[in-house]
């Protein structure tokens, strides 16, 4: 409620004379004074993107907290779970309202610790313990680059603050700013699971499913995007080449993750790679901005932030829907599902809404934000535009492959033992002959997020969030929009033809025909194995 009240008061306040919203610091104290002109403060910064993030984090976190009452009921460590969940939320809220980059780094590390605790919540499972360690180590490696970048930036810029006036007036050493920003992006790439630092995120599915919703929608993985957006004035002004590198890394990551998602059988891992791909879209949107744009790259920046907002809602809906399904069938594998629409109508409809949104079908929210990204990409270069359009088509395909595998086709044999994630007999295992709809504590958040997913696209987002602070009028490019809609519909039609029925001869024939490629994609193109071999080689003594 406090976040909503803050957002209401902030965005309803009169704009400044130059048409921008005021940047406010309602609280700020000096924490570590170094010199008369250089110190580290602790405080609260309110500007359009921090206030927008307050809404995103608070909304998704509230839904996850409510949902968890039903999902985690009867679990051992129930109180511990809520303590870790609240720490996670607090850490992300502290990160987005930080007044300076050192304060951001403090909460950045708290986000990492919180994710470690939640991913390893089932600490008696060796796979969960290994996944939590993997996430912690990979992101700590990336955070070393972030910390070095902060130190380089502070030394040469003479400031750590996020105040626009001070960021615009660097005291010297501007030639070192690209290096500092590049190092900071390494930290952002680790948190946001950009290739090749993405390897921790699929394994993070070992945590409880509501935790996955919070990590993927509103906390850890969007922290890297928020970092690039927060430092955007410096990227666009001093390091445009580094900003373009952000776009290229994001595009490759989006394609790689979409390719892997097309063949996964674990529903949470499909959604995990979907998240990696969609974060790639946000990075591309920020990266294709150029200083030559009269609005200082306004379209890409606005589109990236808009997609962060819409994605948070429909991705939380997808993960919570997946949790409802796992709660019913006690398995993450699509082979244990099929025909569930008959037994879980609320989960079915809400999950379908989220699939339509991420596929970019109007009037759902993902259509509006994704098409603004595609328009920005085409303005940057036709090649980038077509590449991202192709990845959007892959997104529609693998999401409806997932949808049909869960809710259509033949009714799969029901599991006789609970999945590793659950320790409490419920659903089938409690003597119910068929899967059943989840309790109200779980379905109410699904319905709420479904409504938000439908209406969020109609928010005049550019009126509130833009790169230079002034209102940005959104105009759909109907050539781009029409093309992307047509491609999305074709992709959905292909997925329907291949996966809607119980027997899938076309899908099976293609898997046999391209077995090598299918196997490589299923095993994530062996990136994890390559890391393991490299580390073993490095750790062995030279003979």
Which functions belong to the PLM regions below?
Residues 36-57, 176-188, 388-391, 476-494:
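Hydrophobic alpha-helical transmembrane segments
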Residues 2-4, 60-61, 150-151, 183-186, ...:
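Hydrophobic core segments of alpha-helical transmembrane domains in multi-pass membrane transport
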Residues 341-349, 402-491, 498, 502-533:
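Cytoplasmic/organellar membrane-interface segments at the starts of transmembrane helices
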Residues 534-542:
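Residue-level detector of conserved catalytic or cofactor/ligand-binding positions
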Residues 63-104, 113-426, 432:
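Hydrophobic transmembrane alpha-helices and their helix-loop junctions in integral membrane proteins
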Residues 109:
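Short phosphate-coordinating micro-motif centered on Lys-Gly-acidic
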Residues 1-12, 142-151, 354-358, 445-460, ...:
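Hydrophobic alpha-helical membrane-insertion segments
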Residues 1-83, 155-174, 230-232, 241-244, ...:
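Transmembrane helix-loop-helix hairpins at membrane boundaries of multipass inner-membrane proteins
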């Amino acid at each position: 409620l406090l976040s909503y009240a803050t957002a209401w008061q902030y965005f309803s306040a009169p704009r400044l004379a130059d048409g921008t919203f005021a940047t406010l610091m309602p609280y700020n104290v000096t924490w570590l004074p170094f010199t008369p002109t250089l110190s580290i403060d602790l405080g609260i910064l309110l500007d359009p993107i921090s206030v927008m993030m307050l809404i995103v984090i608070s909304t998704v976190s509230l839904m996850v907290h409510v949902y968890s009452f039903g999902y985690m009921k009867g679990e051992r460590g129930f109180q511990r779970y809520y303590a870790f969940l609240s720490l996670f939320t607090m850490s992300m809220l502290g990160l987005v309202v930080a007044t300076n980059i050192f304060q951001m780094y403090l909460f950045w590390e708290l986000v990492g610790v919180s994710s470690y605790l939640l991913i390893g919540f089932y600490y008696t499972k060796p796979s969960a313990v290994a996944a939590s360690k993997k996430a912690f180590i990979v992101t700590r490696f990336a955070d070393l680059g972030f910390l070095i970048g902060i130190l380089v930036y502070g030394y040469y810029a003479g400031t750590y603050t996020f105040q626009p006036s001070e960021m615009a007036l660097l005291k010297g050493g501007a030639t070192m700013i690209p290096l500092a920003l590049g190092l900071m992006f390494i930290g952002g790439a680790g948190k946001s699971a950009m290739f090749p630092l993405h390897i921790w995120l699929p394994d993070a599915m070992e945590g409880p499913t509501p935790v996955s919703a919070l990590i993927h929608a509103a906390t850890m993985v969007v922290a890297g995007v928020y970092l690039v957006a927060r430092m955007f004035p410096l990227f666009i002004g001093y390091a445009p080449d580094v900003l373009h590198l952000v776009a290229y890394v994001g595009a490759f990551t989006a394609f790689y993750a979409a390719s892997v998602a097309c063949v996964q059988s674990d529903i949470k891992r499909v959604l995990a790679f979907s998240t990696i791909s969609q974060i790639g879209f946000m990075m591309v949107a920020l990266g294709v901005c150029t200083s030559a744009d009269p609005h200082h790259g306004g379209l890409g920046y606005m589109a990236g932030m808009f997609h962060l907002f819409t994605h948070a809602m429909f991705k939380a809906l997808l993960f919570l829907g997946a949790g409802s399904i796992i709660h019913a069938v006690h398995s993450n594998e699509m082979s244990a599902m099929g025909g569930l629409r008959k037994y879980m109508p609320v989960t079915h409809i809400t999950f379908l809404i989220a699939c339509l949104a991420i596929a970019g079908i109007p009037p759902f929210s993902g259509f509006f934000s994704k098409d603004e990204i595609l328009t920005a990409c085409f303005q940057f270069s036709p090649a980038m535009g077509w590449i991202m359009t192709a990845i959007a088509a892959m997104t529609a395909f693998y999401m409806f492959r997932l949808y049909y595998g869960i809710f259509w086709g033949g009714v799969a044999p029901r599991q006789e033992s609970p999945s590793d994630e659950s320790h409490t007999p419920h659903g089938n295992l409690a003597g119910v002959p068929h899967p059943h709809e989840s309790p109200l504590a779980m379905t109410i958040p699904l319905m709420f997020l479904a409504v938000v997913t439908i209406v969020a696209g109609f928010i005049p987002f550019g009126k509130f969030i833009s790169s230079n602070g002034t209102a940005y009028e959104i105009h759909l490019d109907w050539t781009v929009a029409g093309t992307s809609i047509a491609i999305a519909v074709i992709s959905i039609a292909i997925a329907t033809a291949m996966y809607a029925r119980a027997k899938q001869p076309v899908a099976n024939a293609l898997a046999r025909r391209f077995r090598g490629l299918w196997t490589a994609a299923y095993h994530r193109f062996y990136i994890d194995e390559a890391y393991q071999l490299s580390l073993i080689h490095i750790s062995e003594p030279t003979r």
